[in-house]
């Protein structure tokens, strides 16, 4: 499978756009998740997608250094998370994928949605809707841990 190059996607669709400006809507196959993650969060489709709209949101709302870091590490955060939490109802997305990279925690929110196909079948699709560096030590304190990489089970 061809490896996704988010910096290239950024250059093609996002770079140089004005804040809040619309972008050409593209859905990008970001990566496939692992079987362990599929079982842990009970999803049926291993493919994880990202839209240019979500990427534009990150570009408009994150500091440049953080956005650049996310461009280069989003696949790793989603494909190999250290922990997965159930996202809060007040937050966008169903799951919070968390990974520690260079002594900082990063969170990517994954939303699972059902899409009607032209043949009438329904397909589950998974989208990254946002990502950011977790700045507050207690940010995840009230989130429910669903899975962690170390034990392949939630810790108590």
Residue ranges of model-derived segments:
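Ribonuclease/tRNase effector modules and their secretory precursors
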Residues: 1-156
